[in-house]
C-alpha cells in the first residue's frame, strides 16, 4: 500500500504540529510502507530525512484554493497512491483512491462570523461536510469534536474515530540553565508573570482575559505581568482597546511568535498558564503547559475539560470575574500550585504521539483491508484441453 499525506501545512502551529509529529512517529514505527508526502518546496529536504520509504513530492497548489481541488487528485494519481490522508478538512472530490480525513474541529461552522467573507464560509461548510461524508474513515482529536461533527454533518458515527493529540517531547524535558538565563534576559522576565500562548482571534477570548487580568490587579496582585505569545497586538483591535481601557500597557506584553524551544522555556518560567478559549477541538497549549510542570487555568467548555481532566482549574470563559478567581486561586495558594503541577505532569504522560500514530496506522490498515486485491489473470483451456493463463503466462508443466 502506498499512502499519501498532505503535508503542505507543515509550517502551521496547530495542524502543522499534528503533521510533524504524525510523520515523525510513522517513520519510527514503519520502515516498509511507502509514504508520499505532498509538501511545499522548502519543506522537502527535512521530510527526505525521515527514511527511504518517505518521499516528499512538491505541491504548490494554494491551501483552500480552487487549484488544490484539481492538483491534489492529479498528484495522487501520478504517484499511484492507494490511500490518501488529508490532515485537515480539505478532501477534493476527485481524489482517485481510498481516503482518511482528520477534522480537528468545527470552528468555521460554530463561529462563521470569524471567516473573512461568504465565499470562505461556503467553502469551509461544503469542504467539511463533503470530507466527512466521502472519506472512508474520519479521524478527530476529541470526543467533543466528534459530537460537533455529528451535529453539523449527517454521516455514520461509526466511521468517526477519536485519536488524541499529544504534546511535543521537548515540553517534557528540563531546559538547560543557559537557555533559561538567555530567555529570561532577552525578554526581560525578571518579574512574576502569567502566560498565554495562542493567537488573538475572537474565539481565543483574549480580550476577556485582559479584563480578568485587570481584576487580578485590582485585588492586590498589581505587580503581576501578563505575557502573550503567538500574535502581535496589532492583529486585534479589541485586545488593543482592552489594554488601553485598563491602562495596562506596562503590564501586558505581546511577544509575537516564538520558536518552540523558546516557548518551552517560557512555560517553565511562568507562574501560571491561562487559556480561556471559547472553543477548541483539542487545546494543545494547556497540555504543553502541564507537560512543563506549569499550573493551568482553562475553560470549562468544548474539549478543554476532556483534555485537562482534574489537572487544571476550570473557569467560565464568558465571565471575567470567574477567570480572575481562577488566577487568584492558583497564585495565592502554594498547595493548589503544587497539586496542579503534580496532576498536570501525570495527565500529560497519558498523551503520546507514538500511541496516536499507532492508532492512525490501525485505521490505515482497516481501510487497506477493504481495498479490492488485484484479480488473478483468467484461465482458459488450449486446444489440447490444458489450462493456461491468458497473457502469455506459462502453465505449470512448461
Question: At which residue positions do the language-model features occur?
Answer:
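Carbohydrate transferase catalytic cores enriched for Leloir-type hexosyltransferases
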Residues: 1-386, 390, 395-398
